Amino acid sequence: MSSTDPLLRRVENYRESCDNCAKSKVRCGKEQPWCQRCERRGQVCSYSPSQRSRKRTLDAAHPESDQRNGTPPFTAISSASSVAAVSTGFSSMLSQADSWGTCPDLVELLTSGSSSESLTPDNNHLVWLSDMESIAGDSNISKSMERMDVFPYPKSIASSAAGVVNGSGAGADSMGRRSTCPLQNKQHCEADLISALAKPELPSLSCWGNPKASQNLGTILTASRATLKCVTTAMSCTCTPNDNVALLATAVLLRILSWYHIVLKNCNGPNDTSAATIDDHTSPTPSNDGKDTERSVSRDTNVSQDGSEPSSLIMPPMTIGAYELDSENRERMIGHIMLSELGKMGNLLSDFSKKFCDPQSTMLGNDNRSQLFLALEMLIRNKHMATVLDVRKKLEVK
């Protein structure tokens, strides 16, 4: 065989636009061999031969070879070096964060100095309506099923897709309806978590120290419940796990734990000697005619042992009908409420582990990304367990 044999350098003509973009009649990113649109939608990006485009070798033209070799097609979203840097940072964070006083404020890093525009997800990564309308009509479902096996889709969706591939047609309708759900919710998860961090009406408490102004206990408990519900919705979503959702969920959970920590610093347990003093400040003063005067919320101020500035927490009175709880019963009630919410957070951490740390659900077995997810889970679990122990210590009865 001569050196000029065309088989030695087999070159074919491929179109500049991938098959999915050409079929949907949208502009292709031309980031060959993987276009950004196909990466965002989780589709197999392929280029059919065409006589009206430039030449590319077969190795660059077929992304399936990269997938077989284990190369993840997610370099457009986050490179391996950036993920490794974040993973290394969180590993050092776990070794240094022995107490809440040394806890790096991940919330401040994400939200400080950012305008509302910067908190909005990048438009380049949004799933547009024109892309959504063409999902159900995309062909080559068998190749999509190969990628579907990598991610944790519900069994109902997987069985419906299998019915389409086998030609049964039983799951065709349900597959067409449900296929848009993960793609729609992928960006909604990030937007909801960012919104939960950026809401101005939420308590501005930080795990670095004390709040700048007094906070209302009712506002803290209400905000923690709503924020925890937002994270629960994100964890139950069937979208593909990604770094952004994991980091945002970690920031939200750390903020909730910081709220509970401030409440614990301002609440005295049933064994504290200062409980009677706080009860004197918080109990309503009866009027001369025997009726309770208008209840004004009181402010409990505790000075931390390390000499830092005092933190204030507004403790509204708690009543059961005409009966008002005294200081000891009120703070015991607060402790049980916090334990109940922390129990929900414990179940949420199990969902976080299944979504991000399970070997079968981690993105294509990327080691750097797996280390990042494990570091985030360890950080949240350590802070969660420390908070649970503090609450139980407050509720101990000698």
Curated annotation (Swiss-Prot):
Alphabetized Gene3D superfamilies for the sequence: Zn(2)-C6 fungal-type DNA-binding domain
Superkingdom in the source lineage: Eukaryota
Gene Ontology MF term list: DNA binding; DNA-binding transcription factor activity, RNA polymerase II-specific; zinc ion binding
Keywords in alphabetical order: DNA-binding, Metal-binding, Nucleus, Transcription, Transcription regulation, Zinc
UniProt note: phenotype after gene disruption: Leads to an albinos phenotype. Inactivates the expression of the aurofusarin biosynthetic gene cluster.
SUPFAM superfamilies: Zn2/Cys6 DNA-binding domain
A single cellular component GO annotation: nucleus
Sequence segments annotated as region (Disordered): 52-73, 275-314
A GO BP annotation: aflatoxin biosynthetic process
InterPro entries linked: AflR, Zn2-C6_fun-type_DNA-bd_sf, Zn2Cys6_DnaBD
Compartment(s) where it occurs, according to its Swiss-Prot or TrEMBL record: Nucleus
Pfam families, sorted: AflR (PF08493), Zn_clus (PF00172)
Name listed for the protein in its UniProt record: Aurofusarin biosynthesis regulatory protein aurR1
Gene of this entry: aurR1
